[in-house]
């Protein structure tokens, strides 16, 4: 029966699919995320010690002591965490200011309520340190007893005592550092005493003891020192502890950084404890009991080590504060002020890189075969192959530990040695101590070195994590094989000799070892083995088959004892249960065989042959790392842990409450991340996510080790802020990079070459590795999976929109000449968008542009509006047209005020052309377009406005022309017609050109002297002329753009050019071949075959429109002229009907006569310092007059009856040159001739368009027939 699923449920199920992580090819440039699977801890802390019934009883008892001491160490660590993470509560509690304060009881009660649990913890801490000191001293006393001094003490036991010494040093330093602990206890004590909470003497005494304990510095150390000195021979045991630490440190018998630093701290603090009233370390050194010169070398090499968190300790301080230092100062070199080369991380980078490359190469070889090919777990390998993988895993962990320790040691040294304004000029004198220790204490090279090492650590952690299952199998196989080979084969010979020589103690130890770890082939030890009887093997040899299993040592269950149970047959994590107990037992028993102390007169070592001793020592040394490697997952995490780079509780304590938390500028993870972003170093850009992983380390440590939620909350808050800043800066950088790339690509190559010739280099943006970052779809940070590409895409989309908006705003803040620059800004943004779309999903550029242009739903956008605004308020009234250059230039004398424009906002260079050099280069290029408006500008207007925008601008211009022609100009025409002479005949040639000039000057005196003629009248006509010219030039530019479009569209419409043919070739054959070649490009048949009906209709309409546009030759200027003609309906333009019924000859009632008068006026030459009409108004003035004349149909009359033309004809005949009425005749004639040529050009252009209109409007020619003229004599006769 099928289950019914609703549509809502189905849709919700589909939505859930988006949450499924899909595998992708994202480049790995971040550390591994924490596994969501649990990490089992199988450390039983020797709880299974009683299961090892075959072991030596003394060492089982010692394991019991180990167990209890480990528990105490864990408790001590908890108190160390408590002290380190202590934040002052008393500062947050209101203080009682006087005894008369009414709410003081309530304040004290709340104080006690809040602080009592914390003070209880402090009381427990005081009791714990007493108990720990007593326990440590009791162990020392037991081991230093006269009868036990020669007894064997295992290395594990000595190291556990060393860990106690380290614990005391840490706890004492933490107690000294935390003033807030003392303040909180004082506040509690004050409140409790007021409320009489501590009435009984015992409570008062305990409180007093706690006060003294917290107040006295080094109280734990002093108590420990005092109690140790009363123990006879304690210095001998401490010398053993120090020596084992020296030996371990010298032979690198440690794995994690914390183990390394613990060895050094135990050396220093141990020497301090040894040097006192009872013993003298210098005498012990003289007796060769300890080696101070070796310790001095270690301390000189590594002067500062981490103590706890961000607390550090100078190892030389232990030496300086010891009792006998002053008289032996000369023996120490570590106490001298010198910088160890260990802290110069930049010099160490060569070796680190070399180690990294060498190990990565070897690891890659195994990774390719084990992980990539998928053969790692399935294939069976030899012991040698397993051993190689085992060694590889160990070397990898040691390398990671070495690098992590190096980072922490440099960081610790920097914290102890903060910079100042004298060492670093960038460090202000008011900088805080933590700021001087972090923010200003690292050079750029050191920051890059830190980032590179961290990247190596985290990157190698990823690679080793991928091979963890392969390593686990190899480790278990190798350890199993090593243990079985050693127990079943290597120990046979010493067992045979011991049986033969009847060394009972040696036999018992060897048998205990074999019974503890042997996994016999048949389930039990071969009873016929000759070595058990002390006999030699037969001549053919005794065959011992040592099995091979992929398991580690497991715990022994007392209830089901069998040798095979020592090793869990199923392997896996079960195979690691109790490995610590087993390995402890085996190693301790082996150590007892080769130790110099045995508790008897003769050591067991002397009973063994030299080769056997060497074999045991070698195995004992190798097996040290077995415990770590069996838990490789945890070891890998510890070796890569850099969490302490964030913690700063010590420095917060130093601020005494002035700081709740430090800003991100002082935080090391952000300092390193921000340094990469600020320097834009290409080689470091792929490492930028690794410093952010330090927050993961710190958060993990805060939750799992410190177990403090407030620390995690602070880390989370800083991560939120830092990641926002990271995305913001990275997105801006990526946008700026691709914007600069686009600007460089589009920059004119010849311009770049010319700049280079003059020594000016315009650089290309250096190649950067942003592509890898843009592929990051799931960055892991504090347990969140972040789509970095999506966040950057959001920011870049906003930046892209802002860039387009800024380009348009920049155009809006300038005049019309800047439209060429606007187009190039948009082209650069278009190329930027195309480059970015290769790596991210952005909205289409056209959609972004329409949004920035406010043209999504409006019929026209900001660019169209500003073009019209500039035309109306600046271009029409203030520009002069020059027909020779085909350009408009700004007038010499403006008749209107400069329009007020908004200033462009100051933005970053990448919002313009990409960078400062590119901005300067493009500014120089486009400065050549700044001083005129010509064909480049009109073509740009056509491309940016399109048909719709051009139509809007034209419509608005026609409104302006209409208002001028029917308003201002019409009123002036009416006025000027009134002051014109009623009749002005053209004088006869006999008067001569001077007489004619004088005649016209006299007749037109009122027009010449009209005050507003050369200002308002000419200005209004200039605006009309400029509007007409703008429409004409837009028409021409649009035609060129259309032709370009048509040529581009031709191959897709099957419009092919005629081909050249040779003699004898047929044109049809060549054309058919060409058509066949371009047939796949023919769009309409293609869409008709493959498209939808809607697509077919669109394709056909587009094809038809393109062809019709090509064939019709549509003209917009004709329509403009026709519209302007409709504005000239007032009778004043044409005058009253002529009395002769034909035309006005001498009457000055038509516009062309008025224009003749105006032309006479501006043809009069001006003085030296005066501006001519063409300088003030340009050719637009003539275009306005001639256009009106043509549209009124008065051109021929104007050519016949124009005053200036008549004067020019006469002057050409008589050639006279006189000055009439201060007017040079010859100069005036020259000016008339120039304007005549201009007028003829204008008439020719206008007639070309008007004739087509007239031809289209009427096919019948209207001819008026007149009667022939009749002589007067005949007329009277008739």
Curated annotation (Swiss-Prot):
Q: State the UniProt keywords alphabetically.
A: Acetylation, Apoptosis, Cell adhesion, Cytoplasm, Disease variant, Epilepsy, Nucleus, Synapse, Synaptosome
**Name of the molecule in the record:** Cytoplasmic FMR1-interacting protein 2
Q: Name one GO biological process term.
A: cell-cell adhesion
Q: What is its main location?
A: cytoplasm
Subunit composition and interactions: Component of the WAVE1 complex composed of ABI2, CYFIP2, BRK1, NCKAP1 and WASF1/WAVE1. Interacts with FMR1, FXR1 and FXR2. Interacts with FMR1 isoform 6; the interaction occurs in a RNA-dependent manner. Interacts with RAC1 (activated form) which causes the complex to dissociate, releasing activated WASF1. The complex can also be activated by NCK1. Interacts with SHANK3; the interaction mediates the association of SHANK3 with the WAVE1 complex. Interacts with TMEM108 (via N-terminus); the interaction associates TMEM108 with the WAVE1 complex.
Tissue expression remark: Expressed in T-cells. Increased expression is observed in CD4(+) T-lymphocytes from patients with multiple sclerosis (at protein level).
Does the entry feature the keyword Acetylation, yes or no?
yes
Give the induction text: By p53/TP53.
The answer to whether keyword Cytoplasm applies is: yes
Q: Tell me the compartments it is located in.
A: Cytoplasm; Nucleus; Cytoplasm, Perinuclear region; Synapse, Synaptosome
* One Gene Ontology CC term in the entry: perinuclear region of cytoplasm
Please give the family membership noted in the entry: Belongs to the CYFIP family.
Which disorder is it associated with? Developmental and epileptic encephalopathy 65: A form of epileptic encephalopathy, a heterogeneous group of severe early-onset epilepsies characterized by refractory seizures, neurodevelopmental impairment, and poor prognosis. Development is normal prior to seizure onset, after which cognitive and motor delays become apparent. DEE65 is an autosomal dominant form characterized by onset of intractable seizures usually in the first 6 months of life and severe to profound psychomotor developmental delay.
The reported result of mutating residue 320 to E is: In RNA edited version
Q: Which GO terms describe its molecular function?
A: small GTPase binding
């Amino acid at each position: 029966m099928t289950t019914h699923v609703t549509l809502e449920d189905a849709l919700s199920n589909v939505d859930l699919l988006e949450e499924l992580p899909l595998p992708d090819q994202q480049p790995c440039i971040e550390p591994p995320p924490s596994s969501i699977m649990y990490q089992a801890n199988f450390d039983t802390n020797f709880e299974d010690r009683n299961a090892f019934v075959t072991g030596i009883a003394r060492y089982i008892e010692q394991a019991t002591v180990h167990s209890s001491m480990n528990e105490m160490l864990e408790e001590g660590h908890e108190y160390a965490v408590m002290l380190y993470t202590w934040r002052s509560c008393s500062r947050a509690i209101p203080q009682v200011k006087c005894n008369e304060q009414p709410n003081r009881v309530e304040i004290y009660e709340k104080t006690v309520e809040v602080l009592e649990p914390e003070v209880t913890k402090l009381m427990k801490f005081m009791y714990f340190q007493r108990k720990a000191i007593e326990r440590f001293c009791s162990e020392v006393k037991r081991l230093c007893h006269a009868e036990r001094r020669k007894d064997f003490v295992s290395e594990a036991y000595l190291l556990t005592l060393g860990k106690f010494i380290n614990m005391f040093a840490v706890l004492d330093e933490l107690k000294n550092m935390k003033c807030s602990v003392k303040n909180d206890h004082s506040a509690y004590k004050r409140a409790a005493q007021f409320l009489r909470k501590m009435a009984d003497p015992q409570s008062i005494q305990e409180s007093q003891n706690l006060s003294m304990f917290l107040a006295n510095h080094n109280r734990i150390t002093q108590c420990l020192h005092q109690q140790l000195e009363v123990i006879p021979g304690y210095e001998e045991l401490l010398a053993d502890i120090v020596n084992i630490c020296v030996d371990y440190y010298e032979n690198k018998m440690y794995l994690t950084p914390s183990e390394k630093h613990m060895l050094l701290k135990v050396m220093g603090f141990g020497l301090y404890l040894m040097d006192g009233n009872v013993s003298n370390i210098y005498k012990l050194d003289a007796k060769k009991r300890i080696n101070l010169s070796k310790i001095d070398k270690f301390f000189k090499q590594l002067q500062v080590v981490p103590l706890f968190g961000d607390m550090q300790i100078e190892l030389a301080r232990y030496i300086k504060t010891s009792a006998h230092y002053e008289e032996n100062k000369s023996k120490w070199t570590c106490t001298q002020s010198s910088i160890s080369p260990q802290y110069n991380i930049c010099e160490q980078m060569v070796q680190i890189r070399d180690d990294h490359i060498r190990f990565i190469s070897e690891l890659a070889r195994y990774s390719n075969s084990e992980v990539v090919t998928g053969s790692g777990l399935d294939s069976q390998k030899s012991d040698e192959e397993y051993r190689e993988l085992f060694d590889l895993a160990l070397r990898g962990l040691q390398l990671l530990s070495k690098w992590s320790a190096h980072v922490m040691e440099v960081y610790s040294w920097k914290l102890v040695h903060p910079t100042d304004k004298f060492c670093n000029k960038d460090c202000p004198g008011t900088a805080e101590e933590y700021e001087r220790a972090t923010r200003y204490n690292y050079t750029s090279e050191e920051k890059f070195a830190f980032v590179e090492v961290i990247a190596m650590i985290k990157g190698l952690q990823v690679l080793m994590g991928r091979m963890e299952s392969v390593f686990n199998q190899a480790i278990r196989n190798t350890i199993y094989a090593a243990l079985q080979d050693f127990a079943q084969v290597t120990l046979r010979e010493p067992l045979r000799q011991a049986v033969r020589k009847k060394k009972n103690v040696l036999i018992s130890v060897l048998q205990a070892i074999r019974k503890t770890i042997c996994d016999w082939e048949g389930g039990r030890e071969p009873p016929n083995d000759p070595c058990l009887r002390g006999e030699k093997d037969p001549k053919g040899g005794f065959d011992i088959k040592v099995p091979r299993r992929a398991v580690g040592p497991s715990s022994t269950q007392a209830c089901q004892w069998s040798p095979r149970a020592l090793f869990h047959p199923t392997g896996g994590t079960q195979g690691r249960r109790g490995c610590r107990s087993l390995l402890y037992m085996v190693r301790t028993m082996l150590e007892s065989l080769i130790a110099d102390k045995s508790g008897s007169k003769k050591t067991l070592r002397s009973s063994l042959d030299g080769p056997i001793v060497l074999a045991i020592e070698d195995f004992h040394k190798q097996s040290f790392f077995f415990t770590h490697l069996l838990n490789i997952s945890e070891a890998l995490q510890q070796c890569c842990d850099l969490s302490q780079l964030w913690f700063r509780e010590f420095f917060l304590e130093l601020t005494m409450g002035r700081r709740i938390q430090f800003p991100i500028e002082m935080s090391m993870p952000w300092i390193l991340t921000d340094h990469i972003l600020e320097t834009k170093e290409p080689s470091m850009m792929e490492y930028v996510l690794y410093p952010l992983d330090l927050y993961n380390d710190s958060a993990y440590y805060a939750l799992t080790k410190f177990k403090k939620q407030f620390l995690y909350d602070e880390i989370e808050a800083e991560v939120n802020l830092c990641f926002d800043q990271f995305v913001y800066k990275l997105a801006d950088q990526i946008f700026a990079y691709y914007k600069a790339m686009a600007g460089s690509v589009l920059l004119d190559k010849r311009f770049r070459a010319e700049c280079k010739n003059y020594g000016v280099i315009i650089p290309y943006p250096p190649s950067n590795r942003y592509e890898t970052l843009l592929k990051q779809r799931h960055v892991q940070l504090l347990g969140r999976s972040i789509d970095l590409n999506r966040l950057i895409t959001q920011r870049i989309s906003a930046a892209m929109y802002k860039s387009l908006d800024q380009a348009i705003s920049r155009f809006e803040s300038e005049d019309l000449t800047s439209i060429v620059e606007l187009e190039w800004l948009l082209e650069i943004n278009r190329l930027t968008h195309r480059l970015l779309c290769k790596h991210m999903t952005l909205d289409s550029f056209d959609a972004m542009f329409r949004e920035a242009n406010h043209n999504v739903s409006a019929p026209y956008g900001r660019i169209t509006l500003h073009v019209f605004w500039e035309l109306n308020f600046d271009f029409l009234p203030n520009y002069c047209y020059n027909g020779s250059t085909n350009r408009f230039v700004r007038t010499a004398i403006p008749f209107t005020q400069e329009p007020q424009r908004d200033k462009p906002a100051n933005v970053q260079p990448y919002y313009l052309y990409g960078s400062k050099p590119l901005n300067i280069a493009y500014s120089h290029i486009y400065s050549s377009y700044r001083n005129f408006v010509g064909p480049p500008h009109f073509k740009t207007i056509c491309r940016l406005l399109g048909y719709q925008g051009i139509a809007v601008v034209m419509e608005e211009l026609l409104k302006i022309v209409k208002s001028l022609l029917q308003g201002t100009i019409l009123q002036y025409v009416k006025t000027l017609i009134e002051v014109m002479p009623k009749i002005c005949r053209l004088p006869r040639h006999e008067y001569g050109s001077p007489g004619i000039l004088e005649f016209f000057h006299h007749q037109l005196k009122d027009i010449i002297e009209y005050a507003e003629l050369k200002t308002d009248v000419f200005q209004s006509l200039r605006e009309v002329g400029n509007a007409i010219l703008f429409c004409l030039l837009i028409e021409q530019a649009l035609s060129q753009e259309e032709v370009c479009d048509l040529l581009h569209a031709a191959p897709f419409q099957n419009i092919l050019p005629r081909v050249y043919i040779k003699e004898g070739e047929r044109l049809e054959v060549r054309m058919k071949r060409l058509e066949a070649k371009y047939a796949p490009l023919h769009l309409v048949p293609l869409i008709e075959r493959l498209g939808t009906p809607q697509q077919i209709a669109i394709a056909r309409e587009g094809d038809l429109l393109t062809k019709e546009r090509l064939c019709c030759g549509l003209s917009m200027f004709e329509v403009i002229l026709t519209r302007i003609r409709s504005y000239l309906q007032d009778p004043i333009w044409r005058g009253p009907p002529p009395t002769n019924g034909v035309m006005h000859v001498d009457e000055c009632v038509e516009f062309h006569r008025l224009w003749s008068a105006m032309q006479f006026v501006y043809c009069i030459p001006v003085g030296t310092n005066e501006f001519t009409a063409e300088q003030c108004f340009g050719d637009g003035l003539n275009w306005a007059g001639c256009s009106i004349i043509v549209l009124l149909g008065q051109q021929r009359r104007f050519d016949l009856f124009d005053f200036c033309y008549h004067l020019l004809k006469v002057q050409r005949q008589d050639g006279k040159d006189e000055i009439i009425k201060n007017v040079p005749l010859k100069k005036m004639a020259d000016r008339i001739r120039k304007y005549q040529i201009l007028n003829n050009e204008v008439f020719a252009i206008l007639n070309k368009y008007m004739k087509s209109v007239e031809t289209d409007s009427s096919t019948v020619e209207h001819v008026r027939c007149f009667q022939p003229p009749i002589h007067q004599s005949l007329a009277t006769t008739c």
